[in-house]
Amino acid sequence: MAGREDGAAAGAMEEGQDSKEVKCESSEDGSSSSSSSRCHGNDVISVQFMQKVHPWCMCMNKNLLILAEILGTYFMIFAGCGAVVVNQSTGGAVTFPGICAVWGLVVMVLVYTVSHISGAHFNPAVTVAFATCGRFRWKQVPSYVVAQVLGSTMASLTLRVVFGGGGGGARGEHLFFGTTPAGSMAQAAALEFVISFFLMFVVSGVATDNRAIGELAGLAVGATVAVNVLFAGPVTGASMNPARSLGPAMVAGRYGGVWVYVAAPVSGTVCGAWAYNLLRFTDKPLRDIANTASFLRRSSRRS
């Protein structure tokens, strides 16, 4: 009897040792599995859970990203260009500093609103710059660019319907809220390149570096936009964004100098993103905006 009990105990111990390791593998159809274990002495009881991700859910997730970019770009253009239209139609009631403040504030608010959903690009140049640095998938670039241009065009159409601007005639000419160079094309291209470089340099610093204060990313980006509009607005309109220029141009049918507002912002943001990457002194992996670690979080953990 004692021998049988010893054999049974030894067998139980062997089974307990064999059950210590649990392997979880993902199935080929998109399902994922995890395990939960409870320990009693040397025995481990493992229970596996499997969660299947339906392709329809993955498709809906991608659609939500596109929708966030459309809505974000729409409200940004509607507020920013709307301030321009209201200022023109009311004889300067908003004032130029007020226009700068509107652009900066609306960008700040929208960054805080949808950055955790789509990244809050709202700008084809920013999307392309992120892709060149490996922070955004190239296969998603076309859908993002289309969404941003669509949002800008919809906002421009809304402003045209509400205020009657953007068309022909004296009133349409007066209320045009697109971007046109006040000086030469070379001057406009150079200035758009510099302010786009500056914008993307700031975005790369506050929104993608895991050592930055991530909670202040929206404030920093919005302030940068306001500063750029303040000193470059009278010369070029301070576009920094091909979608911001293409939307009003397509609605009004005015394409003079539009190539400047496509080529200069794209080249400027790409150079700005790479310039910051050269200054980055860390071997840690790059993180998405939603997962950005910050100085404030690290300080709270230390305390």
From Swiss-Prot:
Its main location: membrane. GO terms for molecular function: channel activity. Keywords: Membrane, Repeat, Transmembrane, Transmembrane helix, Transport. GO terms for cellular component: membrane. Residues 1-39 are annotated as: Disordered. Residues 17-26 have a biased composition (Basic and acidic residues). InterPro entries: Aquaporin-like, Aquaporin_transptr, MIP, MIP_CS. The keyword Metal-binding does not apply. Pfam families: MIP. The chain crosses the membrane at residues 66-86, 91-111, 145-165, 188-208, 212-232, 255-275. SUPFAM superfamilies: Aquaporin-like. It is a multi-pass membrane protein. A motif (NPA 2) lies at residues 241-243. The keyword Transmembrane helix applies. A motif (NPA 1) lies at residues 123-125. PROSITE patterns: MIP. Expressed in roots and leaves, and at lower levels in anthers. Aquaporins contain two tandem repeats each containing three membrane-spanning domains and a pore-forming loop with the signature motif Asn-Pro-Ala (NPA). Belongs to the MIP/aquaporin (TC 1.A.8) family. NIP (TC 1.A.8.12) subfamily. Aquaporins facilitate the transport of water and small neutral solutes across cell membranes. This is Aquaporin NIP1-2. It comes from Oryza sativa subsp. japonica (Rice). The lineage of its organism: Eukaryota, Viridiplantae, Streptophyta, Embryophyta, Tracheophyta.
